Amino acid sequence: MSKQDEVIVVGKFGASYGIRGWLKVVSFTDQPESIFDYKPWLIQVKGEWVEFSVESWKRHKGLVCKLKGLDVREEAQTYTNLEIAVKADVLPELSEDEFYWRELFGMEVVTTKGYALGVVDDIFETGSNDVLVVKANLKDAFGKKERLIPFIDEQVIKLIDREAQRIEVDWDPGF
């Protein structure tokens, strides 16, 4: 799938808000309000991604928005918990040393000594740094099923090779 066709989930709808078709928005973007910078929104309706335009949005105990053409509460309620997506090509381009999390999923993780630790299965934030969840190889000699590796540039993360889909880390395989 080309970047032009790739669909990225950036949030989801919460409950309806008011009687005029407004919906609460749960943003998955780093800066929650930036979800409104990405246009058009794609919403999966009956198995198909359909384009929608945001007519208006505001802050109210979180974020709420009004979609163009959605004017009554009852119709808005049918959108509760639906995902909000955008095409990947509307996201900002990053510099060579920056990555979207989605780019790291599935990458092979190896130590600087060549020991294969597994593949990136998930990533989560902590107060100080992001953490890679690496699903270990089935035949791992250390009996690990997964490893949590801090995403600390230069100290732990030595190299990220987009072409080879590989991350090199300075990490003890025993952990």
UniProtKB/Swiss-Prot annotation:
SUPFAM superfamilies: PRC-barrel domain (SSF50346), Translation proteins (SSF50447). GO terms for cellular component: cytoplasm; ribosome. GO terms for biological process: ribosomal small subunit biogenesis; rRNA processing. Gene3D superfamilies: PRC-barrel domain, RimM. Its main location: cytoplasm. InterPro entries: PRC-brl_dom, PRC_barrel-like_sf, RimM, RimM_N, RimM_N_sf, Transl_B-barrel_sf. It is found in: Cytoplasm. One of its GO terms (molecular function) is ribosome binding. Residues 95-175 form the PRC barrel domain. Keywords: Chaperone, Cytoplasm, Ribosome biogenesis, rRNA processing. Belongs to the RimM family. The PRC barrel domain binds ribosomal protein uS19. Binds ribosomal protein uS19. An accessory protein needed during the final step in the assembly of 30S ribosomal subunit, possibly for assembly of the head region. Essential for efficient processing of 16S rRNA. May be needed both before and after RbfA during the maturation of 16S rRNA. It has affinity for free ribosomal 30S subunits but not for 70S ribosomes. This is Ribosome maturation factor RimM. It comes from Aliivibrio fischeri (strain MJ11) (Vibrio fischeri). The lineage of its organism: Bacteria, Pseudomonadati, Pseudomonadota, Gammaproteobacteria, Vibrionales.
